Regions:
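Enzymes that bind and transform nitrogen-containing heteroaromatic metabolites
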Residues: 1-161
Length: 161
């Protein structure tokens, strides 16, 4: 599995159910990488998508203990059930796309994290684990410093150390 996430300087990812940032280059990268792949998310992340609908051109799996059946979505009620669902997945990559609790629960099952680091510190109430403080992770590659609408950011790929 691969986690894909945009974080603030303090590893914040969201506030009040919304993303902290809307960066076109980041969204384009997300679409390019995840299209025709499997994406795993929590119930609140699904509800935050446009119309609360699953992402098109992807296999959408929601990890939730209390989600009702929804068209276009497979539901896993536990990590064990999720792992069984994706065991024979033909997708080249399986992406974990949030939110905070799902990232924390599935990070031990990820071999890579594709991170957009935004050099800003808006208030957040959902966070991604600090990979720089975790010796199990190391930076594999990073882009040059980019800027869009006054926000400076980098694409940083982490792999297990």
């Amino acid at each position: 599995m691969v986690a894909i996430v945009a974080v603030s300087e303090h590893w914040g990812i969201g506030k009040d159910g919304d993303l902290l940032f809307s960066i076109h280059q980041d969204m384009r990268r997300f679409r390019t990488l995840t299209s025709y792949m499997t994406v795993i998310m929590g119930r609140k992340t699904l509800e935050s998508l446009p119309g609360g609908k699953p992402l098109p051109k992807r296999r959408n799996i929601v990890l939730s203990s209390r989600m009702e059946p929804t068209e276009g979505v497979e539901i896993a009620h536990s990590i064990e059930e999720l792992l069984a669902l994706v065991a024979d997945d033909p997708a080249e990559e399986i992406y974990v796309i949030g939110g905070g609790q799902v990232y924390t629960a599935l990070l031990p099952h990820c071999e890579k994290v594709l991170l957009t680091k935004v050099y800003a510190s808006p208030e957040a109430d959902a966070f991604f684990p600090d990979l720089d403080a975790d010796p199990a992770w190391k930076v594999a590659s990073e882009s040059e410093l980019l800027e869009e609408d006054g926000l400076k950011f980098q694409f940083i790929d982490y792999v297990r150390a």
